[in-house]
Amino acid sequence: MKNIDKVIVHCTATPEDRHTTVEDVRRWHLDRGWSDIGYHFLVYLDGTVHEGRSLDVQGAHCRGQNKNSIGIAYVG
């Protein structure tokens, strides 16, 4: 595992009443030419945590900060 020195929290900027899944976000990122979902974890509206990108792979969630960070996004 890489040397993690920060956790970066994002929101999906989706409607709060819309059920959004890891696959929804993955599809959105792939449609924009990314290699996979950019976040390592996604927190659903009910508070459950779901894995996105593997922790063994550098995230794609915050330009200039991806190398040593974990990206977590919450739906909403």
Where are the regions that the model predicts?
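Short, conserved "active-site rim" segments that organize catalytic pockets and cofactor/ligand binding
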Residues: M1-V57, N66
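Peptidoglycan-targeting cell-wall enzymes and recognition modules
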Residues: L55-G76
